[in-house]
A protein has these predicted regions:
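Signature of extracytoplasmic/envelope-associated structural regions
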Residues: 1-302
Length: 302
């Protein structure tokens, strides 16, 4: 009987520093990798002035992946936030923490090797579960075995319960509360550049996917922290309609059981305001941390 790979039967595992984490992701999981084609002109035997295009495939583009997790009160998902924000300085330079990602279905086990998270977004909608959506790139995607493949790493025990966070949203701009909040988002973008990895010598020996050239190393460029804050336009705040600032301090936090849960303390932001016309008028602060932060792990805590 033919076995299919079904998303609803899939499980997602992170392997980092010898530890394995089984993630409870939302259904929005995706991953892929494409190969680069090099086309060239080829003359025909009967007419040397006529050309057709030949092709050569010797290298792969970086693989892509994305998934989302609920940030629960037990904080079993803290590894995802750490991989998004924290540096790996073990080699004497500031790089992102890398990891391997395994997706296990009822038929296959897929591996994304050398993953780095390039973007993460915290969805802080008022009265909704707190969700972290991440996407990134990896060196190589492969099928490493069937569903019974033995995953590496020591499994980190998860909590026996999972409690979603229906958070109370609290936002301050220059130490002043932003009233009448509707929603907010917080985004981290890690801009990376893969080091050129194609060589003529290696390209001549490529015969299949098994010996094709794959990305190996990258450099980390700038890091951007940004987001938006949407509030209802009322008599309490209409006097600040259509404003901007180039040096403001923005604090975004969620409160769970009267305690701070997620906290982003951003010093030195620019923001602009824009209006939104709907049944209830709103205005949105679009903000960005002006400087590339030295240590995001201490600026955004969870």
């Amino acid at each position: 009987m033919t076995a299919y790979n079904l998303l609803r039967e899939s499980s997602v595992h992170i392997v980092h520093n010898g530890s394995r984490y089984l993630l409870k992701t939302t259904p929005e999981v995706s991953f892929s990798q494409t190969f680069a084609e090099d086309a060239y002109e080829v003359k025909t035997l009967h007419d040397q002035t006529k050309m057709f295009q030949g092709t050569s495939v010797t290298k792969a583009n970086p693989a892509n992946f994305s998934f989302a997790v609920h940030l629960t009160q037990e904080k079993d998902e803290s590894i995802v936030k750490s991989l998004l924000t924290d540096y790996d300085t073990s080699n004497g330079e500031q790089l992102l923490k890398s990891f391997d990602l395994y997706i296990v279905t009822g038929e296959s086990t897929f591996k994304l090797e050398g993953c780095v998270i390039t973007q993460g977004e915290f969805n802080l909608a008022k009265g909704s579960p707190l969700i972290l959506t991440v996407s990134g790139q990896a060196k190589q995607l492969s099928r490493v075995g069937n569903a019974s493949y033995s995953l590496p790493g020591s499994l980190v025990n998860a909590s026996s319960t999972r409690t979603p966070t229906l958070s109370l949203l609290d936002v301050e701009v220059d130490s002043t509360d932003v009233p009448n909040l509707a929603t907010a988002t917080l985004q981290v973008q890690n801009n990376i550049n893969w080091t050129p990895f194609e060589t003529l010598q290696n390209s001549l020996s490529v015969t299949s996917v098994s010996n094709a050239m794959y990305p190996t190393t990258y450099t980390l460029g700038d890091r951007v922290v940004s987001g938006n804050i949407t509030q209802y336009l009322t008599s309490n705040n209409s006097s600040t309609f259509q404003s901007f600032d180039t040096s403001a301090n923005v604090a975004v936090k969620t409160i769970v059981n009267d305690s701070t849960f997620l906290n982003a303390n951003l010093t030195g932001c620019m923001f602009t305001k824009r209006s939104n016309v709907a049944e209830a008028y709103t205005q949105t602060f679009d903000f960005r941390l002006v400087n590339s932060p030295a240590n995001l792990g201490t600026i955004i805590t969870y």
